Every structure is written in structure tokens, then in C-alpha cells.
Amino acid sequence: MKVKAVASQIPVTPRKVCLVVDLIRGQKIKEAEAILTLNSKSAAPIVLKLLKSAVANAVNNFNLNKDDLYVEEIFVNES
């Protein structure tokens, strides 16, 4: 089951966000949170907040276990 979270109107360029997003694609949630917490890029806190939102959606709306979740697909668009 796919769980979705969307962030819009973020004050960082898509190119900079893409560098951070590429680090966590395919990772388990705990590993992705650790990577984002230790990352010094300006987009890391924004992506971490979005990741936590997606996890909260999965746990609260679909009763999924946080330990079983991973980042299957994450992407950045210019808009």
C-alpha cells in the first residue's frame, strides 16, 4: 500500500531538494530519518518534516507498523 504526503511552496530550489531526496530513496524509515537528521543541507529539515507526515498518515489512517515502512518513491517537481 502506498501512502502519500505532498509539500508545496517550499523556499528551496528543486535542484537542492533533489540532492537530499536522492539520499533517502529506497531506505527504511528509521535509516532515512537518521540520514536527514545528520544532513547539513538546507532542504533536509523540510524533507524530514514531509517524511514524518507520510509516516503519520500511514500509522493513523491505515494502521501500518512504522518499522515495516520504507521510502519506495520520492520525487521533486518544479511548480
Swiss-Prot record:
Keyword Acetylation: no
GO biological process: translation
One Pfam entry name: Ribosomal_L22
Domain of life of the source: Bacteria
Annotated Gene3D superfamilies: Ribosomal protein L22/L17 (3.90.470.10)
One GO MF term attached to the UniProt entry: structural constituent of ribosome
GO cellular component entries: cytosolic large ribosomal subunit
Keyword Membrane included in the entry's annotation: no
Keywords noted in UniProt: Ribonucleoprotein, Ribosomal protein, RNA-binding, rRNA-binding
Similarity comment text for this entry: Belongs to the universal ribosomal protein uL22 family.
Function: This protein binds specifically to 23S rRNA; its binding is stimulated by other ribosomal proteins, e.g. L4, L17, and L20. It is important during the early stages of 50S assembly. It makes multiple contacts with different domains of the 23S rRNA in the assembled 50S subunit and ribosome. The globular domain of the protein is located near the polypeptide exit tunnel on the outside of the subunit, while an extended beta-hairpin is found that lines the wall of the exit tunnel in the center of the 70S ribosome.
Subunit-structure text: Part of the 50S ribosomal subunit.
PANTHER family xref list: CHLOROPLAST 50S RIBOSOMAL PROTEIN L22-RELATED, LARGE RIBOSOMAL SUBUNIT PROTEIN UL22M
The protein's name in its UniProt record: Large ribosomal subunit protein uL22
